Amino acid sequence: MELNMPTYNDQIEEPTDGLLLMGKLMQGEWSIEHEDEKRDHSSEHSLSRVPLGLTLEDLEQSCKSRENLLRSRNTVSQNAGNSLRAFKDKPTNSQSGSLIRNTEQQNRQLKEKLNFLQEQNASLVSQNHSLMNKIDCVQTELTKSRSRIRYVESAIGARAMRLPDLEERILTLEAKADAQENALRTTEDQLEHSRHILAEKERILQMFKDEMKALKEELFASCRLCKRTEKQRNEALFNAEELTKALQQYKNKMTEKMEKVQEEGELLKNKFSNCEKEQDALQQKCVMLDTELEKSRDALRNLQSENIIRQERHQCVEAKNAELISLLTQSNQRILRLESELEHKEKALQENIDENKAMKDCFAKSKQSETISDQPKEQPADSASDGSGKLIADLRAKLLIREAENKELQAELVNGKLLTNRYRNSLEKNCLDALEAEPVKLNLQNTAEEKYLQLELLCKQIQMDKERLTDCVKELQGKLGKAQIELTNTKLSMEQRTSQLQLIQQELLEKASKTTKLEQELVKKRMKISALQKLVEEKSQVYSAAEARNAGLEEKLKNYKDQIVNLEDNINKEHAEVLLALERSKDIHQDQQKELMKQIEHLQLQLEMKNLHAGEQKHTITILQQETLWHEQQLESVNHLLTQARKELEIQTKNTSAAMKSLQNQVEVESAKVSQLESALTVCKEELALYLHELEDNREQFENQIKTKSEELWCLQNEIKLRTQSLQETSEENVRLQQTLQQQQHMLQQGTGRIGELEDHHTELEKQVSKLEFELEKQRSMSEDMLQRTKDSLHAANKELGLKTEEVQELCSTLNQVKLELKHTNVTLLQMEEELVSLKNKEEKNASMLKLLQMDMQKTQVELDKKACAVLELEEKLHIAEKDSKRTEEMETQLSGMQKELDGYTKQVEELQETLTKTHLSVEEKQVIIQGLTEKLRSYKQELEERDHEVLDMDQLLKDRNWELKQRAAQLTQLDMSIRGHKGEMEQKIIRLESALEKAELEARDHIKEISSLDERLQQARDQLCEKEFDLMQKDQIINQLKKDIERSHQTVTDMEKTLKVQERRISEKHQDGVDLSKQVCLAQERMQLTHQELLETRQQLAEAQKESDRLAQKLEGMDLISKEKIQHLKQKLEETNDTVCNLKTELQARNEVIKATNEVLILKESELTRLKARISSYERTLGLKQLSDTTALPSISFTDPHPLDSSKHPEASDFKMWHISPSISASNLSLTDMSSLELPKSMLEDLRNLAPPDSPPMKDTSEGVSCVSSDSLNNSSFNPLTYALDENSDFTDCPDLTTLTGMLKYIKKEMRLSEYPQEHSPSKAAGIDGGSLG
């Protein structure tokens, strides 16, 4: 660049430049005063943002800036002196306030002056650099002009006429050169002075940097503290939310319990009324059943007697049937014989009939012969008639015998027909055949026919009797079948009852053992509950202390939040300043491009002027035109190569070929300046090497930090994986435990169902339902105590809720304050934006002023060009032109290289802009996240308010329900008072036992409820674990995003390192080619300055990137700490859950033992119930026997037991005998003898004694001193089977017979004895049983 100082050329333009500089200084001071407050907040960036590059604006400032500096210093010193004098003159009372104010004002003034001095130093440095560049240019021009003059003097001797003019011009040029040398010396002095000032400022900068490092460390510590406080606050909020949830659950549980208690009270009332109704109905049923039993027993006895008679009759009938069958067989045989005899007799009869006929004929013949032979023949006739009379008598005897035999046969046939119907027809046929066989006899003998008719009538009567008897037999057989069916049914019912009694006995034994175990476990659990209450009190104390700590931490949080807000404001301001700096850098680049274009245009104008001068000097440059044409051809070839570059540079190369011809004489002067520039370049390169070395060190440190943090992240990821695996295992274990819990709950439900069924049976069998009211009183008292406790706990919870609501309100107020501060910061930001707009307007004004100054500079440059045209007239040699052409080619190659470098730099600038846009996007995303968090906070506040309203509603409902419960309790107490009057002394023992039973049942229910609550807690813990796992997943995602961001930053850093390496290579290439860069050093310097600025900007961006990486590293460290703390918290919670699971296991085992104990107790009670049932049956039997005794007569007593007193003396022997006596024995003796064997309670024995008739002898019993109870007491007070025990001494030697009731009772007694002996762990119950037996 061919620029010279305007002050040495034209003295006319000095005042205008001075005025402009003064105006500019005034504007700078005014802008400095407005930007002091900003620079106080962002001192770090203000120090790092000193303009280190040179621009054309700095060339327009003159040396008057130093005078202004001196004037300002003098004014400051005068002001300071005046302030000190004024301070000395002031009185002592206002010394402290004035001192503080003066010191503050002085500090402000010093800060302003420091900033002003820094800017002036920067401007002086830039001016020095510009002056050095101008001096170098002038020196190069002088050397060129001198060399050209020498060349012209040696070459052209004919032009001696122009020598004096040229000498004058040379003298003027030398004078100008001397003046410029003097200016250079002064500028060198200024440079030395500015270097000293720079050294001091660098020392001050190092001090400030150290202070900034300390401030950064403090900021990092404060950020960590803020994060920790935020974590603690979040944990406190989370704990508060958990407590609110727990309170809501507790309230829900309490309401459910209260509702259940109310429902149970109502159910108990209903049950009580139902029980009373059922009791009355049962009593009526018992009376009806007693009557029915008596009737059924009478009917059974009648049936038994009838059965016996029927059996006897049946036996007789069977005997008769057997006899009849034998007779039938005999009759059949006889019939066969008689048939054979009848055939013989028929034959004989026919023979007799023939003989009779013959006799009749003979008789007729004899009569005729008699008549013929009168008297002489009388004697032989008498003899013949005597012979025939004998024959007739014999025949009649035979007929009579046969008739008798026929009658016998007919009688036998009738008997056979009565027994069987088979032989009736055959016998009748035989009889008819027999009767028909003798028609002659019947006709002859009327007596036989009459007898036959009588026999037929007898047969008919016998048949009628037979039919009647068969009907009776059938009826008797039907009755027998019914009786047998009834007997089988009774046997089956007896067997079922015996089996039921055995089962009930076993269940009662199990329930008794279960109740004992439940009582033991209840004692243990009461101890545990007391210990837990102590732990709860200790935890409440710890919680109160933690709340106090939380309050202090919240105050600290507020302070830290204020600091964070201030820091965020500072960060936002710095960010805005960075954006402004980037915009300024962009504007500067654009201005530089515009300036370069203007310089190119200016050079084009210069070239046009030079072409005009060349037209005037065509005579002197005819020889050079050929060479110029040759050079133009070469330039055209170079232009073809540089088509990718700018077209304007091709025009510049064409015009520079003509311009370099006139600058051949200045090469010698420029060589010296080139050496100086080379030394400056070496210094710059050394500085660049140092900067690069620092960059490499920083890069290595950053890489090492990234490696360490990546290793830490890897370790953390491994830990998180292990933790997730452990959490999964614990979740699986929890699932298994839940399954076991569900199974055990199912078993408990089954056990409770069985217990309920047994209780139902027990309540059905028991008749003393009225005694449950005493237990209701106890339950009410217990429920009132529980209600009072719950009220106290609710009051405490309400207080805690009030405190927490106050804390929430305080947090809301803090949030509102934060919102107000945010609004205030937004307002301040708007103000700052307005100030930035005003500053931009001022900068535009300054730019217009700079444009005016540039116009002035252009005018001075035109004048310098005019002066140089005079020198160009002397340029005529061709050798130097050839060298210039070569140099132009080299410069063109260098220009192409520099253009490529500029392209690379533009690419780097674009990449940096992309990184900035990415950072802006990340900042915007963070702002969006902050907005989302604020919205979540608002939603959480709304939810807390809704929960507070719900809690208030629940409190009102609880109060209403408590009032209703109190009213109901009062009503129940009145009912209890009315019921207590109807209770007796005998009921108290039963009430105690039943109260213990129901307490155990209630405690079992409470345990079940506790198990359900523990299940709910387990589910809540699982939900919390799921939420924490979700949070861990989110954190893992955030860490992955941060890793990606770090990788991107790594990529950007690697890209920057590559660009730095490329720049180093290019710098080395420039160092190699620095010797050849003689003519375009100014352009190279400007470009180097641009590169230096870009390097500084890159350094700033690298510093910002390092800061961002440090911030990310700090965030990662914070996240690591948070994750570690959360992992520790999760570990603690897991340990707590494991402890709770172990406790649950132990509690489940204990409850299983309790359930077993209750089952054993229930088994015992069921056995006792079986005993009672047996005794009730014996009691009913005695009553039946008593009623039988009233009906039977006294002689039976004397018949069965002639010694009743002896039997009463020996009850056991009489026992064994009396159960085997036939039912005909009277029951009165049994009532006297079997009382001791039945083992009835003493009240029932005395009732029986009272009911016994006065004639019966008195009973003797071993037990004495028994209180007599009337029969009304039996009706009023129900019978309790648990108040007495078995007599252990009454044991039989022989085996019991289960077919009889005594055998069953003996068997039950033995089983009870066997069940009572192994129960060594419950001596109190055995003592109670013994006491009952004694009482």
Curated annotation (Swiss-Prot):
Basic and acidic residues composition bias: which ranges?
1313-1323
Subcellular localization, per the record? Cytoplasm, Cytoskeleton
Task: State where composition is biased (Polar residues).
Answer: 71-82, 92-104
Keyword Transferase among UniProt keywords:
no
Q: Main localisation, per the record? A: cytoplasm
Protein name as catalogued: Cytoskeletal protein Sojo
How is this protein annotated for GO cellular component? cytoplasm; cytoskeleton
Q: What gene name does this entry carry?
A: sojo
Q: Which organism is it from?
A: Xenopus laevis
From the UniProt entry, list the residue stretches annotated as the region Disordered: 71-104, 366-388, 1313-1335
Residues annotated as coiled-coil are: 92-1183
Q: Which UniProt keywords apply?
A: Coiled coil, Cytoplasm, Cytoskeleton
